[in-house]
Each structure stands twice: as structure tokens, then as C-alpha cells.
């Protein structure tokens, strides 16, 4: 492990007077179908980012879902998670959003609790008029005292108004926060990422912001452990597995998020 000399302070709608510890970069997490960054080592209540519409019109039989997430298991592997992001209408149709035209993109929000037999809350909003590379801002806020989850989706002005959603949280605790791509088939089922002939950028995550349960703020790094997520040929770390999709290094886009401009708040996801 290595540490970055960064500090994060503050909160979503709250101030913090004590200093926070430096950010920590954790061991890379290897999968067959996911790529991005995951924060762990704290309980989290807020995550936001601007996600760009994927540059993947030429892909067939593979559909990237991109989203921000709070969960009680690494890589969404626990029994509770909440997500907000972008997916293709082809995938959304398989979940009942029949008015989503094939070839277009939609925003979505989703809350999952295994004890409630799967996703208990979901909403879609067609991203009409967007082009590849256009940004859509998403935020998820967990109001623990009110036992509520709040979602905000802000598309480009040409694609409609800001969307607000709220649902119950059912006493959730979220020790993981991530921003990632998840590669699926047309039904939304995760599938191994195939071999690509040429490297290309799939999409970007900008203006990343995370807040812990106790109000410590950061970007994609902060007073927690941040781990890179790679999709490899067999789910094993390189060199045992060949990296097929991975995020770029974290960089700074200079844009304000959650009340401040912070370093290391952006990355791209690349087919390798």
C-alpha cells in the first residue's frame, strides 16, 4: 500500500473541525466485468459524480452500465446496494422500461435489498438528445436518521429537468462507495469483458465526491482506502490475468463538487 498526502474535511451539509488522515491507495480489485474505483474502510452516506455517455455505439453483444454506488459489500456483493447511473435502453427494456428506444441511453436509480427479494425501488428517465461524451450528474445521499435514500439526476439542459427521487433505506449501513462500469449482456446480466483489438476510452467519471457517515469529505480519495477495479480475462490480477478494461489514473478536473474543488476527482475507463 501507499499513501497520498491528501486531506479531506467537511461533510455533506455539515462541518468538521478535526483533521482527517491521509488517503490510502489499496490493492487492486480484479473482476471479469467491472472497472473503476472503490472506497472502503469507513461507512459512507454520500457519493456524486458526473458520468459521460459511453463511446460504444460500435460495440455489439456487450452493454456497459456505468454508475455510482453505495453498498454493504465490496463491488456490490453484499445484500444491500443503491445505484444511480446510465445504461442502454436495450438493457432497460429487459427490466420493463419498454418506452426506451433501442439505441438510446437512459438514466436510472435503483435500491436493492436481498431481504425484500431484489430491487425494491427503481426509476428510469430517457436521456433524449444526448450525444456520446455528454455529462449527466448523479448523487446519492443516505439520510440515516430519517432512514431515507435521496437521488438527484441532473441531465444536460437539452435532455429535460433535474430528477429527484426518494425511498426508504431499511436501516442500511454502507461501508463501500464506488464509481464504476459494469459490463453486461442485453438482459443486464454481468458477462466477462471480451478481447478488444484496439484501446479506446469508454467513458469518464468527473466531479467525484464522497462523504463518510460522520461527515468527512473527499473526492474519489479521502480519509479512507481507495482501490482500483480492473476487468481481466479471468478475474485474476495481472499478470495472472490479462487486463481488458481498467480505469486511468485519478486526475483533477478543476470542477467544484460537494462544495469545493478537490484533487483526484476524475478518471476515464479504458478498453485495453
Located regions from the model:
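Secretory targeting and sorting signals
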Residues: 1-15
Amino acid at each position: 500500500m501507499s499513501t497520498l498526502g491528501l486531506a479531506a474535511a467537511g461533510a455533506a451539509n455539515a462541518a468538521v473541525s478535526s483533521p482527517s488522515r491521509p488517503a490510502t491507495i489499496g490493492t487492486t480489485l480484479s473482476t471479469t466485468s467491472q472497472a473503476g474505483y472503490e472506497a472502503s474502510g469507513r461507512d459512507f452516506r454520500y457519493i456524486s459524480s458526473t458520468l459521460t455517455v459511453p463511446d460504444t455505439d460500435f460495440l455489439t453483444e456487450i452493454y456497459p452500465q456505468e454508475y455510482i454506488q453505495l453498498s454493504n459489500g465490496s463491488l456490490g456483493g453484499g445484500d444491500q446496494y443503491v445505484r444511480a447511473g446510465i445504461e442502454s435502453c436495450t438493457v432497460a427494456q429487459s427490466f420493463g422500461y419498454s418506452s426506451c428506444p433501442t439505441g438510446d441511453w437512459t438514466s436510472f436509480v435503483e435500491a436493492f435489498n436481498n431481504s425484500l427479494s431484489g430491487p425494491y425501488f427503481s426509476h428510469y428517465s430517457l436521456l433524449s438528445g444526448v450525444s456520446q461524451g455528454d455529462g449527466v450528474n448523479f448523487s446519492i445521499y443516505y439520510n440515516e436518521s430519517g432512514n431515507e435514500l435521496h437521488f438527484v439526476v441532473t441531465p444536460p439542459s437539452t435532455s429535460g429537468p433535474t430528477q429527484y427521487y426518494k425511498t426508504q433505506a431499511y436501516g442500511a449501513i454502507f461501508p463501500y462507495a464506488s464509481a464504476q462500469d459494469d459490463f453486461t449482456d442485453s438482459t443486464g446480466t454481468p458477462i466477462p469483458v471480451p478481447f478488444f483489438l484496439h484501446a479506446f476510452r469508454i467513458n469518464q467519471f468527473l466531479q467525484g465526491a464522497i462523504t463518510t457517515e460522520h461527515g468527512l469529505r473527499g473526492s474519489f480519495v479521502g480519509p479512507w482506502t481507495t482501490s482500483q477495479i480492473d476487468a481481466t480475462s479471468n478475474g485474476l490480477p495481472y499478470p495472472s490475468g490479462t487486463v481488458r478494461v481498467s480505469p486511468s489514473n485519478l486526475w483533477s478536473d478543476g470542477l467544484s463538487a460537494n462544495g469545493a474543488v478537490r484533487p483526484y476527482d476524475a478518471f476515464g475507463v479504458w478498453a485495453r
